[in-house]
Amino acid sequence: MVIQKWVGARVGLMGNPSDGFGGKTIACLVRNFGAQATLRESSTVEIVRHPVYDPLSFSSLEHLEETAAHDGYYGGIRLLYATCSKFRHYCRERGIQLPDRNFALQYDTNIPRQVGLGGSSAIIAAVLNALMEF
């Protein structure tokens, strides 16, 4: 079984970031950009790193430094890890029985980083949609 979920980028026109404090916003979808989560049934729970956004090997120390300067120290793995953990916690706290199955989870995105298009939110929403269907 393979589940794929896509969530579009969004741009906040008014109110950002007041929504984080109970405020209201006006936002719109940017269809050109989005994030996708792919979930496959597996024998273990596996979070698959993105080869571009979650690098673990570099051609040189200079390449590592340039990557860190451009992308920061965190990739999308932490978002998948946190979403899965919080999903499990939410279900357990509410007595929602989850099936006794494991999965491999990966993401892809073409949302530009650090430009206010909600890239992290789109990844989280796509993962959550895939987990709920699974």
What would you call each of these model-derived segments?
Residues M1-L117, N129-F134:
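ATP-binding N-lobe of GHMP and related small-molecule kinases
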Residues S120:
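Short, conserved phosphate/pyrophosphate- and ester-handling motifs at nucleotide-, phospho-/glycolipid
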